[in-house]
Amino acid sequence: MSKVSGSNGGDSKNTLYCSFCGKSQHEVRKLIAGPTVFICDECVELCMDIIREENKSSMVKSRDGVPTPQDIIKVLDEYVIGQRQAKKILSVAVHNHYKRLAHASKNGEVELAKSNIMLVGPTGCGKTYLAQTLARIIDVPFTMADATTLTEAGYVGEDVENIILKLLQSADYNVERAQRGIVYIDEVDKISRKSDNPSITRDVSGEGVQQALLKIMEGTVASVPPQGGRKHPQQEFLQVDTTNILFICGGAFAGLDKIISARGEKTSIGFGATVKAQDDRRVGEVLRELEPEDLVKFGLIPEFIGRLPVLATLEDLDEDALIQILSEPKNALIKQYQRLFEMEDVELTFHEDALREIARKAIVRKTGARGLRSIMEKILLDTMFELPTLEGVREVVISEEVVRGSARPLYIYADRQEEKANASA
């Protein structure tokens, strides 16, 4: 039967060492004993990370040699909390995209159109993070572009061809690989038409960008300058066919929920008029009723929406979801800060009510999960400033009062822990 030795256990004359990293039992939290060997908790965690990475790389393939939607969503679940429907739509879309490419190479008679995706959801609900996570688990070139930096060709700003250049760079200038890649265009709501009425001035960063994106999203041979920047006649271009590139667009679309709610209202006047109560539903609930016509009213041109046939809406995050985001994912914020404190040989502990108060603050700020890090930084700033110069601190405890700003974090010193241990003995 294996025995487990704590980091404080054992006689000083018989110090035990990890058989893998060589650290002594006093340098680690736990040392697990087996037949003639020992392994520490740090090596166990390292082994678990290696196994997870191997499982990720050896995802079960379907008959077409493409990762199955179930396997894609399984990996997404490790990093992204909630948003089940959006994750399902993304995993199916990515699976179908590459199945379509495999099918096209086998049969030239039937041509399957690609289904680009539009992600709609409030700020901080995970749109960008979903796309970033997809990039890590899908072995194809991937790039992210910010729609706010794009302008119509001939004006100051980035050309839409620069998006393809970034994809080409992520593929190490392998044109064949780049032509099977994924492009995520963020902040696409910021290129909406500035006005419903035609104007005598050109809208070079709004409707003009939408028009410029149409061809590369549908499929065209783009001439990409290998060094980037503006084109000039003496420059050689790389030809990239965008027909098989999957485009995912995302945006917060602030105010879109009001357009959707107004569509369902019936206006009437007079004594018999129906008085409709104010829509008290959360933004995410209203967005479930999204129709393409709502995006047209918001300011996207019909041709642009037509290139994005798959609409996926994301929920705004409630208190419980934010608490899960803080503590549960593989790279959760709490785990990141605990790792930072471990570098100072200090254990960082959060009370449950402290996590709940952090989530409440993020909801009040209306920044979703994006606001969690700034709240954590503010809470831990003084502690991280003082800790490197303090001696003997073994644990820092964060309570609800600390999050509210009415108390300071509790510092627990090593000598007090020893006193408690002696008293209990």
From Swiss-Prot:
One of its GO terms (biological process) is cell division. Gene3D superfamilies: 1.10.8.60, ClpX chaperone, C4-type zinc finger domain, P-loop containing nucleotide triphosphate hydrolases. GO terms for molecular function: ATP binding; ATP hydrolysis activity; ATP-dependent protein folding chaperone; protein dimerization activity; unfolded protein binding; zinc ion binding. Residues 6-59 form the ClpX-type ZB domain. It holds the Pfam family AAA_2. InterPro entries: AAA+_ATPase, ATP-dep_Clp_protease_ClpX, ATPase_AAA_core, Clp_ATPase_C, Clp_protease_ATP-bd_su_ClpX, ClpX_bact, P-loop_NTPase, Znf_CppX_C4. Keywords: ATP-binding, Chaperone, Metal-binding, Nucleotide-binding, Zinc. Zn(2+) binds at residues 18, 21, 40, 43. Belongs to the ClpX chaperone family. ATP-dependent specificity component of the Clp protease. It directs the protease to specific substrates. Can perform chaperone functions in the absence of ClpP. Component of the ClpX-ClpP complex. Forms a hexameric ring that, in the presence of ATP, binds to fourteen ClpP subunits assembled into a disk-like structure with a central cavity, resembling the structure of eukaryotic proteasomes. NCBIfam families: clpX (TIGR00382), PRK05342.1 (NF003745). This is ATP-dependent Clp protease ATP-binding subunit ClpX. The gene is clpX.
